[in-house]
């Protein structure tokens, strides 16, 4: 059975291990020391999802009144997914549990800022699929670009213009 609970300082080692060694889409920005640098400016409301003793996912978030935001102290956030054993069905269950939690906590809105694909070790959109499947909608889109420094490519005029 999938459960979720708020992050606690006692979870730091487990959280950082998952972020650094076992996630498909986390970056160093999700390590607790980096996140807690902003502790005085954001009400941390990060969540830990588990299935029995197995860690299933993390959600780096802050709370602002009745809004849960994929952490306000970071450029992006979203669901931190493991590199193995997590697919669309699990993502749907996690998002369902997140919605139930928000209802119970009188949170009326979730702002989700996914990790750009260029930072994924194993790119996937299981989280985006689950959000859309559960009735979520896109409210904002951002452009991400990457340059392979081992094979630089000069952007053409159309790329520069957007």
For the regions a language model picked out, list residue spans one by one:
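Acyltransferase donor/substrate-recognition loop-hinge adjacent to the catalytic core
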Residues: 1-12, 124-162
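Conserved donor-binding loop and adjoining core beta-sheet/short helix segment
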Residues: 17, 35-104
């Amino acid at each position: 059975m999938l459960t979720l609970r708020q992050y606690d300082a006692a979870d730091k080692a487990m959280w950082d291990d998952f972020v650094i060694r076992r996630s498909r889409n986390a970056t160093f920005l999700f390590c607790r020391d980096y996140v807690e640098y902003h502790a005085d400016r954001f009400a941390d409301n990060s969540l830990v999802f588990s299935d029995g003793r197995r860690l299933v996912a993390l959600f780096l978030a802050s709370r602002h009144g009745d809004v849960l935001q994929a952490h306000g102290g970071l450029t992006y956030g979203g669901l931190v997914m493991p590199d193995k054993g997590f697919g669309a069905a699990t993502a749907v269950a996690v998002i369902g549990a997140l919605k139930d939690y928000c209802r119970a906590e009188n949170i009326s809105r979730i702002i989700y800022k996914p990790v750009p694909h260029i930072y994924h070790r194993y790119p996937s959109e299981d989280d985006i699929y689950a959000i859309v499947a559960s009735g979520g909608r896109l409210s904002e889109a951002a452009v991400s670009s990457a340059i392979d420094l081992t094979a630089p490519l000069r952007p053409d005029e159309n790329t520069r213009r957007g």
